[in-house]
């Protein structure tokens, strides 16, 4: 166990609750002490939805510790069943309440005798997996549960649809731009003449799950959530799945070609090449932009990428392949899936970092001094501290990355959005000069206020004057190098002479 003030992936119960609260008319009961119940607040604050978060905490308090939990948990399940009439109630412990080692499956079976809806225990090892793994496992478990139930009742629908159709897996609450991605994928499938059979779990009813085998194939746009459910359906019904993330022009085309191959293997005869060509050359602005003079200004610029596997790998490829940007470091916090990430990005970047320690990532960014960072909310904080611009490309994210406007990341419109994000994240060279020339008499003073607040170093008047003569777009780097030079030599007052000496040392 370690104390952290920042976690990239939360504990397992958060993943289970994200899946349960993504479905329509599914309620979750969390068996937990009061400190673990922050999910409701987090989701209510971040997700722009009108409905209350369908999660109830069955609080583990001193009475429960004295008498055992069964009575309270069963009572909470049956009460919520009577009040809300959900189709399914999911019971989940947290890592804290798991210490009690109670037989929760027994509680579920006991509650099921009285409840009208279905009751299920989320079968997740809270000490071994994180939020993303638990979400993937819980989604698979719910799909399995309803396929088995339909089979038992004899109403499982296995007959394929007449036209090619798809199930889209992995869109969840609190996901990165998931709502917009779902809309864009529906549009893309419609353009390809493919019917959307179901989008699971976001907004889906559990009653739809018995019809999942009707689709011709499953699409899993995010590596973190949905893969286990797609693998289960492949084993049970021989349903193929496509797990190529359609982020960026190149990967979107690769995903569409894979879809073409999958549905042609089932008797269709489609050719999506004209569609890919039309979208790439004329409809999407991304390919045109990457050949423009604006993009050539970015060639060779240095960047650091960090996020979940899906988005970090996709952005690394876009930066390196489509925009000619030099990726110094590509990183992920999904340590459990390290091999896949390394295989995806190693040829597109100088170095790969797999870690969930935000301090390690911050140190790497400070050491490398990239022109821009593409990361999570945490990297945004790091960028602000180091005065390096940052584009947010992956969860965990704060409220500004749950946009009201339409901002997908997948498909051809997603490619346009990503191009804007990348281009606007780099500081343009002339910007600082123009600010200095036209910004009024106090501009230089404002710009040099970035001298470290917690610094043990003092800049003399002549040192600051010399620093202000340096062009704005490299001033931050020169300042940091000079301060490092001074610290290494135990110099506390930085004069113009120290600045010259530091420049010579770096030059040498």
From Swiss-Prot:
A family per Pfam: PCP_red
Catalytic activity: chlorophyllide a + oxidized 2[4Fe-4S]-[ferredoxin] + 2 ADP + 2 phosphate = protochlorophyllide a + reduced 2[4Fe-4S]-[ferredoxin] + 2 ATP + 2 H2O
GO molecular function per UniProt: 4 iron, 4 sulfur cluster binding; ATP binding; metal ion binding; oxidoreductase activity, acting on iron-sulfur proteins as donors; oxidoreductase activity, acting on the CH-CH group of donors, iron-sulfur protein as acceptor
Organism whose genome encodes this protein: Leptolyngbya boryana
Cofactor binding mode and count: Binds 1 [4Fe-4S] cluster per heterodimer. The cluster is bound at the heterodimer interface by residues from both subunits.
UniProt keyword terms in alphabetical order: 4Fe-4S, ATP-binding, Chlorophyll biosynthesis, Iron, Iron-sulfur, Metal-binding, Nucleotide-binding, Oxidoreductase, Photosynthesis
Quaternary data: Protochlorophyllide reductase is composed of three subunits; ChlL, ChlN and ChlB. Forms a heterotetramer of two ChlB and two ChlN subunits.
Highest taxon of source: Bacteria
NCBIfam families: DPOR_BchB
EC class: oxidoreductase
Protein's name in the database: Light-independent protochlorophyllide reductase subunit B
KW Oxidoreductase (keyword) present: yes
